[in-house]
Amino acid sequence: EALKDADYAVTDDNATDIGIIVGTSEGALGTCCDFQSMITEKGNASGSAFKFPNTVYNAAGGYLSICSGIKGYNVTVTNGAQSGLASMAYAMSVLRSGQENAMLATGSDENSDTMTELFGKLGVTSENVVAPFAGNDGFVLSDGSASVLIEDEKAARERGARIYCHASGYGMAHSNVKFGTLTGSEAGLTNAVNNALADAGMTIDDIDAVFGFANGMKAV
């Protein structure tokens, strides 16, 4: 859908000029657990060679390449709930390096019985509608996927692409806090914002809107 919306046709001539970055937090964890349970209960011989490829994290990237015909850069990254954004940042780095003219950045995760059980035991899920800020009592698990086509600006304009936005910069940082801790992570967030501003050559006064990651997480 992203390629269709961008009116970008993958051909033999440009197949190596476009790459794929997939970001996923849990990947094929459900499939991995099912596969492990099968060989644990029935022995190694029960492991299917047809099912095993679906247990690796980069399975989605491989399938995207096969289905789309894209033959360039193909990498899978995992960075927790930020994996989708990380795929976009990685894609920007590849474009800046000049290795590709376009990158399909995708964020995708599936829910599974394993994830439902895990987060349920941790006590971080909610039985109600997600309340992102005030009254947050946990998040609700679900499937989700989104893709964007990020291009070199010159290449995009030359082909007459419909441009939604210009990605000026990105930043990453980390706070050494345990899962389920809602305080103490401010320094990491501040560093990430400052890094993004520096990368974009902007100041805080240049920012008109801020969109927060708010999944209703509660302290445990």
What are the residue ranges of the model-derived segments?
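Conserved beta-ketoacyl condensing-enzyme motif
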Residues: E1-Y63, C67-T76, N111, I204-V220
